[in-house]
C-alpha cells in the first residue's frame, strides 16, 4: 500500500510524528517537495529529533529514506542533519538515497532570498530566508544545478560559473550586495560530492521496484496545503506544490499507484509569517493556545499565529487532495478551554460564503461565522483509548467528521509516538482503539 501524508493547513500540523509512528510497517519514506525551510519534530521516549530534509522514517532501522526530484537540497543543511543523526548512532548513509534529478540549493539562492525580503520591508512575504524560492526559480528556468551534476566535475564547474555570474548581476547591481565567488561555491560542492556520491541514484526506479514487491511506501509532504504555490493563499505561500498531486511529480511515482491520502490537521489552526488568517485569535485565548501548544517554529523559532478550527479552508483542502482520512493532532491543547469554536462559514462583504475566495484582498476582509461547543476541561494528554476520552471531546470529533465528510482515523494526544489513538487501521498497525 502506498500512502501520501501531508499537512492540510499552513504547516506545522505534526506530520513528522505521524509518519514516524506509521513507519513500523513500511519499506520506504519519500520526501517529494520543499527544502530545509520546515522541520518535522519527532519525540521518542522523551528524546527530541528535528528533521528538515531527511524523511521521518530515518529513526526506524531498515527503512529506506528517499529524497525525491521535487526537493531542493541544501548541501550544508543535509550534512549538518546527517552529522546530528550520526551522533545519535543512526546510520544515515545506509538508509538515505537522493534522486539524481534533485536540484541543489546554493549560496546565491540564499543571498537572493534574504536580499529580496529585506527590500520588501514591511510587505515581506515572511520566507525563512533559506533560498527555497530562488532555487525553484532556477529549476523552472532550466539553469538549476542537480545532484547528478556532482558526478561530472568539469561540467559542474562551468555551470556554477555561469549561474553565479547570472545571479551576481542581481545581487550587485539591483540589491547592492556583495557578489559571490563561483570558485568557493564549486569547492564546497566538491567536498559535499565525496560524502554523498554513494547515495545519489534513480529514486523513481527504486520506488518502482518496491511497488512491484508490494512493499508499503509513505510519501511525506512538507509545509501544508494552504501554502501551495498554486492553490494556497498566494502570494503568502511557499515555492512548491504542497498538495497530493506533487507526490507523483516530485518522486517519479505514477499517480494511479497511490492508495490513500491522509491529511494531518491540528484541532485548531496556526500560521507563521504574513497572510490572511480568518480565524486568528489576537486576544488572550490566542496567547493561551500558543502557550499550551508551544507554538514556535521548529526551524526558525518564530512564534506562530493561532486561531480556531476553520472548516471552510479544510473543506478546500479535502477537495484538492482527495483526502481519504484525517489525522487530528494536538487535541490536548484545547483541554483547558471552556468553550470551543468552529468556523463553519465566512462573512465577506456582508455575504455569508461557504468557499474560501482565491482573491486575497477579499479573504483578508472575511470574518468567521462560528458554531460554539462546550469544552471538556479535563486532560486528554497521552490517551490511547478513544472510549476514555471525555464526552465533549468525542462530540467535537464527531462534529468535525459530520462537517467535513471524511473520517478522523487517528488522534494525537501528545508529542510522543505512544500518545496516539488509532481508530482505523493503517497498513498493519496493531494499535487499535475502542469506540
Curated annotation (Swiss-Prot):
This is Adenylosuccinate synthetase. Belongs to the adenylosuccinate synthetase family. SUPFAM superfamilies: P-loop containing nucleoside triphosphate hydrolases. The keyword Magnesium applies. Plays an important role in the de novo pathway of purine nucleotide biosynthesis. Catalyzes the first committed step in the biosynthesis of AMP from IMP. Keywords: Cytoplasm, GTP-binding, Ligase, Magnesium, Metal-binding, Nucleotide-binding, Purine biosynthesis. The lineage of its organism: Bacteria, Pseudomonadati, Pseudomonadota, Gammaproteobacteria, Legionellales. It catalyses: IMP + L-aspartate + GTP = N(6)-(1,2-dicarboxyethyl)-AMP + GDP + phosphate + 2 H(+). The active site is at residues 12, 40. It is found in: Cytoplasm. GO terms for biological process: 'de novo' AMP biosynthetic process; IMP metabolic process. HAMAP family: Adenylosucc_synth. Mg(2+) binds at residues 12, 39. Pathway: Purine metabolism; AMP biosynthesis via de novo pathway; AMP from IMP: step 1/2. Binds 1 Mg(2+) ion per subunit. Homodimer.
